[in-house]
């Protein structure tokens, strides 16, 4: 199997057929809904909160609310449904989550999307939860993860998952690869390609995205949707603490399995970093969309489908050659 990551690959351009990149359509469909871009901010505590979720939904973007404030989930679903907005939440696999799903079914609170979100998703615990969700909330689109192998994708799809989330530990604040020796860190793009070949349903690429070009590369290698943490962290609206050092403003960003999220030092597979303040989230979303429109124009098409068909090369030394924006 060819092993490579985002920075080892360059996509090869095709003849451009549009007069302006603004003609290129970045929309994507996942389940019963279409969204402005194939991008979703990570369901992490320093990336998304209820206010950001609402803003994203109002503006046609996909979102997944994190699962770290369990009590807030029912009121959140009610509020979003009252506003006529898409509801998309996360669940874990512990005992209490089964009762939570039953409560939703009993109260007629049917979310549009539920993401089963654990670090090692190729497990009986996840398979059991998929089956429980499908039985209790048959109308809900179920995303399950995280996984890193074709076997895992097939097994979760067969259990009833409507989409699988691929990526074990490639994220910027994830240290699974260091703490355990396992994961897709350093070969996330190849893992995505490997999994996508086996998938019959959509795949969400999760982790390792460091540039906007990586979104196009993810689409090329089989992703329907791309989950992004660090590029969405550090904005004005981002949850989390702010600090000022030597006149520079920083915001915190920590992993979902870090001691900062858990509140204890137990099975820690995440860390905390401070990122330079990036301004408004809306500006980043606009820039991301414009860059993706440019990617489509380089691919020689008018929509995301064009990117899926382009040729690519694997470059021996990193394409960035030390360059940063």
Curated annotation (Swiss-Prot):
Gene3D superfamilies: Aldolase class I
Domain of life: Bacteria
MF term (GO), any: GMP reductase activity
Keyword RNA-binding: no
E.C. number: 1.7.1.7
CDD domains with a match to the protein in the record: IMPDH
UniProt: NADP(+) binding residues: 203-226
One GO-annotated biological process of the protein: purine nucleotide metabolic process
An example Gene Ontology CC term for this record: cytosol
Cross-referenced InterPro entries: Aldolase_TIM, GMP_reductase, GuaC_type_2, IMP_DH/GMP_Rdtase_CS, IMP_DH_GMPRt
Catalysis: reaction(s): IMP + NH4(+) + NADP(+) = GMP + NADPH + 2 H(+)
Keyword Oxidoreductase appears in the UniProt entry: yes
Catalytic residues in the record: 174
Keywords for the protein's UniProt record, in alphabetical order: NADP, Oxidoreductase
Similarity-based family: Belongs to the IMPDH/GMPR family. GuaC type 2 subfamily.
PANTHER family assigned: GMP REDUCTASE
NCBIfam families: GMP_reduct_2, PRK05458.1
Entry function: Catalyzes the irreversible NADPH-dependent deamination of GMP to IMP. It functions in the conversion of nucleobase, nucleoside and nucleotide derivatives of G to A nucleotides, and in maintaining the intracellular balance of A and G nucleotides.
Protein name: GMP reductase
The species this protein was found in: Enterococcus faecalis (strain ATCC 700802 / V583)
């Amino acid at each position: 199997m060819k092993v490579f990551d985002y920075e080892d690959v360059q996509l090869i351009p095709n003849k451009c057929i549009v007069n302006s990149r603004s003609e290129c359509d970045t929309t994507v469909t996942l389940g019963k809904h279409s969204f402005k871009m194939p991008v979703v901010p990570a369901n992490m505590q320093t990336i998304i909160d209820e206010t950001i979720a609402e803003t994203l939904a109002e503006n046609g973007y996909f979102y997944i609310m994190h699962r770290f404030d369990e009590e807030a989930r029912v009121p959140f679903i009610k509020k979003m449904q009252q506003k006529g907005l898409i509801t998309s939440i996360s669940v874990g696999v512990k005992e209490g989550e089964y009762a939570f799903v039953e409560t939703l079914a009993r109260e007629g609170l049917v979310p549009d999307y539920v993401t089963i979100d654990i670090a090692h998703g190729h497990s009986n615990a996840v398979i059991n939860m998929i089956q429980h969700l499908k039985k209790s909330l048959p109308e809900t689109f179920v995303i399950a993860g995280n996984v890193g192998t074709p076997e895992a994708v097939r097994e979760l799809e067969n259990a009833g998952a409507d989409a699988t989330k691929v990526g074990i530990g490639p994220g910027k604040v994830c240290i699974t690869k260091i703490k355990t020796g396992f994961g897709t860190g350093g070969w996330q793009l190849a893992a995505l390609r490997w999994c996508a070949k086996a998938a019959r349903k959509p795949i969400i690429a999760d982790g390792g995205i460091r540039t906007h070009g990586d979104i196009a590369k993810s689409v090329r290698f089989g992703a329907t949707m791309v989950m992004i943490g660090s590029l969405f962290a550090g904005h004005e609206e981002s949850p989390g603490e702010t600090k000022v050092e030597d006149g520079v403003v920083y915001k915190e960003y920590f992993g979902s399995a870090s001691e900062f999220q858990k509140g204890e030092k137990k099975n820690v597979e995440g860390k905390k970093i401070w990122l330079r303040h990036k301004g408004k989230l809306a500006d980043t979303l606009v820039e991301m969309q414009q860059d993706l429109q440019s990617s489509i124009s380089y691919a020689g098409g008018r929509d995301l489908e064009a990117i899926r068909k382009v040729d690519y090369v694997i470059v021996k030394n990193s394409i960035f050659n030390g360059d940063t924006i």
